[in-house]
């Protein structure tokens, strides 16, 4: 599971997901990418499930890049706890994803294989996504 080795602050505020992604919006490493079309918190478990789905379909051919990292802790109070008495303890980690963000990239496989691999990965994610190809791709 992806998570930071250490953080400056154990707990963070929830924040808001306004607007589109400012960076990470172009395919930089591979030839194919999976782009987010909606804002969401993507958990480290969802990222891992998508990664496993892609690598299994691609039969470990090619290369996959994960372009998002879960660096935001989400807290949760224990079950049957009364309100008040402070914030809960960190339970899991999420990556804040805004529309336009490239979440995964792949290379070294045919276009049809990449399309299907990203389709399987998208089923593991809680948002609408789009398969995109690098503009200068020759295939």
Swiss-Prot record:
Keyword annotations: Ribonucleoprotein, Ribosomal protein, RNA-binding, rRNA-binding, tRNA-binding
PROSITE patterns linked: RIBOSOMAL_L16_1, RIBOSOMAL_L16_2
SUPFAM superfamilies listed in its UniProt record: Ribosomal protein L16p/L10e
Highest classification ranks of the organism: Bacteria, Pseudomonadati, Chlorobiota, Chlorobiia, Chlorobiales
UniProt keyword annotation of Magnesium present: no
Annotated Gene Ontology cellular component terms: cytosolic large ribosomal subunit
Source organism superkingdom: Bacteria
UniProt feature coiled coil, ranges: none
Record-linked Pfam families: Ribosomal_L16
BP GO annotations: translation
Family: Belongs to the universal ribosomal protein uL16 family.
Protein name in UniProt: Large ribosomal subunit protein uL16
Disulfide cross-links: none
Gene name linked to the record: rplP
PANTHER family: 50S/60S RIBOSOMAL PROTEIN L16, LARGE RIBOSOMAL SUBUNIT PROTEIN UL16M
Subunit comment: Part of the 50S ribosomal subunit.
General function of this protein: Binds 23S rRNA and is also seen to make contacts with the A and possibly P site tRNAs.
GO molecular function: rRNA binding; structural constituent of ribosome; tRNA binding
């Amino acid at each position: 599971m992806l998570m930071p080795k250490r953080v400056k602050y154990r707990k963070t505020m929830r924040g808001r997901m306004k607007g589109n992604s400012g960076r990470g919006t172009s395919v930089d490493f591979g030839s194919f990418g999976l782009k987010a079309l909606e804002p969401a918190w993507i958990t480290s478990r969802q990222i891992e499930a998508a990664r496993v789905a892609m690598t299994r379909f691609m039969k470990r051919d090619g290369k996959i890049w994960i372009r998002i990292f879960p660096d935001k802790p989400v807290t949760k109070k224990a079950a049957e706890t009364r309100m008040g008495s402070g914030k809960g303890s960190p339970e899991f980690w999420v990556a804040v994803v805004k529309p336009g963000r490239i979440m995964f990239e792949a290379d070294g496989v045919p276009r049809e294989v990449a399309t299907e691999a990203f389709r399987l990965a998208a089923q593991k994610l809680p948002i609408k996504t789009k398969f995109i190809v690098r503009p200068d791709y020759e295939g």
